[in-house]
């Protein structure tokens, strides 16, 4: 215990925290082998729809996936610092944590030139960085023999950003068979939704046709689908042997 905390009537407890962790993760890797091409009709279960032919039309269907022979484990490095502070005889408790996570050599299926005979390759194709803030405040508002009232507030904010992808790869589709879909794109936040937007004038106003907005015909970034922040609070009280509590939560999404 620190000497200045022993008789301190305001700050009676304080703790600083710091941690470091590094974790490796291997993907599912299979040796490349010869795969006998087949014939199919229209489309098949692999993503995306490769050839939009009418149902029943047979066409050449090559094996669609190849594996990088130099595939390396994905590496995650995490740094975390924080503080726990208690005030006024621990009637007010404040906890704060900041974490930074760097993920390198992320393992993705990336698109490849169709001339190779494949659609995608499993390879190390990404680097991502995550910043996170967590704040928790708990206060004993009233304390008596037969009655007490407590309030708790929490706040969390997480920012994910794709730092880089494999050379020549602009974006990687991670979810969604057709648009809209989730993509990882270098230099952008993650996860972002991509889909068809609407035509707008120079002032940003929608261009309408028969009262309806017109499609731009081009895929564009529609915004981040994860909450900009999450927060909540709990309120609880006790009267003799009867206790009651309530919990509220809120997520704010800002595209």
What name fits each language-model region?
Residues 222:
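Aromatic-residue-lined binding/catalytic grooves and analogous aromatic/hydrophobic interfacial grooves
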Residues 225-255:
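Glycine-rich, aromatic-lined ligand/substrate-binding cores of catalytic
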Residues 68, 198, 202-208, 212:
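Solvent-exposed beta-strand/coil patches in large extracellular/periplasmic or lumenal scaffold regions
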Residues 214-218:
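Short Pro/Gly-enriched beta-strand edge/turn motifs at strand-loop
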Residues 1-185, 232-240:
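Extracellular/periplasmic, surface-exposed regions of secreted and cell-surface proteins
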Residues 54-58, 196-198, 204:
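Acidic/polar loop-and-plug regions of large Gram-negative outer-membrane beta-barrel proteins
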């Amino acid at each position: 215990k620190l000497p200045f905390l022993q008789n301190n009537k305001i700050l009676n407890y304080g703790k600083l925290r710091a941690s470091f962790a590094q974790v490796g993760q291997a993907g599912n890797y299979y040796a490349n082998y010869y795969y006998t091409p087949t014939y199919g009709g229209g489309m098949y279960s692999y993503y995306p729809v490769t050839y939009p032919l009418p149902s029943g039309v047979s066409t050449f269907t090559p094996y669609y996936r190849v594996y990088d022979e130099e595939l390396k484990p994905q590496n995650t490095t995490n740094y975390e610092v924080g503080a726990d502070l208690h005030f006024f005889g621990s009637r007010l408790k404040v906890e704060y944590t900041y974490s930074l996570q760097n993920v390198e050599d992320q393992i993705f299926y990336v698109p490849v030139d169709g001339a190779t005979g494949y659609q995608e390759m499993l390879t190390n194709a990404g680097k991502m960085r995550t910043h996170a803030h967590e704040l928790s405040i708990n206060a004993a508002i009233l304390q008596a023999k037969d009655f007490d009232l407590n309030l708790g507030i929490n706040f969390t904010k997480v920012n994910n950003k794709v730092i880089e992808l494999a050379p020549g790869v602009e974006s990687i589709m991670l979810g969604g068979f057709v648009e809209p879909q989730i993509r990882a794109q270098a230099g952008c936040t993650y996860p972002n939704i991509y889909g068809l937007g609407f035509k707008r004038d120079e002032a940003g106003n929608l261009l309408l046709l028969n009262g309806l907005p017109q499609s731009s015909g081009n895929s564009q970034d529609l915004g981040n689908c994860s909450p900009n922040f999450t927060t909540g609070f709990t309120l609880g009280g006790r009267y003799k042997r009867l206790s009651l509590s309530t919990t509220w939560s809120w997520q704010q999404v800002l595209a």
